[in-house]
């Protein structure tokens, strides 16, 4: 009488284990790849959101620039737009100005709709500074917000006929501002904002 086989041989078991092990290894590699891609996408998404937030701040602030000179801490008159190398202790160029359009619903808060804002390069980042006061703002500590990593900032101002490297008018604001920002993440970024000037 012939005996029939009632199971797998050792060789068949080893081949099956090898196949399942290779399938498990491939599945793990696919999972690791998807995790790495998701992490890279999330990191890039975070950087892109920060860039969009930075451009949004700049756009809202610059397009609301007011031709309003300010009074310094000692009562001295300062220009409506203060810009140049070292302004606000910037490691590159910086700028400070008064903007309007700050929301004060039903005038319930004891403040105006004006805000003094500034931008500078500090510790490798573009920073936005905001003072609640328009006059003698130096006597109040500003709120600072780190924006995108940046190592240089260059500003130019359009007076209606030509671009200038500096702005010297005490009361008037330029027609447009050109900003060239160098960021290690994004390279060179150039943007032009049309303002309310000349006024």
UniProtKB/Swiss-Prot annotation:
GO biological process, one term: protein secretion by the type II secretion system
Disulfide feature: none
PROSITE patterns linked: PROKAR_NTER_METHYL (PS00409)
Main location: membrane
Domain of life (superkingdom): Bacteria
Post-translational modification: Cleaved by prepilin peptidase.
InterPro entries the record matches: N_methyl_site, Pilin-like, T2SS_protein-GspJ, T2SS_protein_J
Protein keywords: Cell inner membrane, Cell membrane, Membrane, Methylation, Transmembrane, Transmembrane helix
Short name of any one Pfam family annotated for the protein: T2SSJ
Transmembrane segments: 8-27
Membrane-topology descriptor: Single-pass membrane protein
Propeptide boundaries: 1-7
Localization (cell): Cell inner membrane
Subunit structure: Type II secretion is composed of four main components: the outer membrane complex, the inner membrane complex, the cytoplasmic secretion ATPase and the periplasm-spanning pseudopilus. Interacts with core component GspG. Interacts with pseudopilins GspI and GspK.
Function: Component of the type II secretion system required for the energy-dependent secretion of extracellular factors such as proteases and toxins from the periplasm. Part of the pseudopilus tip complex that is critical for the recognition and binding of secretion substrates.
Family recorded in the similarity comment: Belongs to the GSP J family.
NCBIfam families: gspJ (TIGR01711), IV_pilin_GFxxxE (TIGR02532)
Protein name: Type II secretion system protein J
Organism: Escherichia coli
Organism lineage string: Bacteria, Pseudomonadati, Pseudomonadota, Gammaproteobacteria, Enterobacterales
Protein encoded by which gene: gspJ
């Amino acid at each position: 009488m012939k005996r029939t086989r009632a199971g797998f041989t050792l060789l068949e078991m080893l081949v099956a284990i090898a196949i399942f092990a290779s399938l498990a290894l491939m599945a793990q590699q696919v999972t690791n790849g998807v995790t790495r891609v998701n992490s890279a996408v999330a990191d890039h998404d975070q950087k892109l959101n920060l860039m969009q937030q930075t451009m949004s701040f700049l756009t809202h602030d610059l397009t609301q620039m007011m031709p309003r000179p300010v009074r310094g801490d000692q009562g001295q008159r300062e220009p409506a737009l203060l810009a140049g190398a070292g302004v606000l202790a910037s490691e590159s160029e910086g700028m400070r100005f008064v903007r309007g359009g700050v929301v004060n619903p039903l005038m319930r808060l004891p403040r105006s709709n004006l805000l003094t804002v500034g931008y500078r390069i500090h510790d490798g980042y573009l920073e936005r500074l905001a003072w609640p006061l328009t006059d003698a703002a130096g006597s109040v500590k500003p709120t600072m917000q780190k924006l995108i990593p940046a190592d240089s900032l260059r500003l130019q101002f359009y007076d209606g006929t030509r671009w200038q490297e500096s702005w010297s008018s005490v009361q008037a604001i330029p027609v447009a501002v050109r900003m060239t920002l160098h960021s290690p993440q994004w390279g060179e970024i150039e943007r032009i904002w049309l303002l309310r000037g000349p006024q």
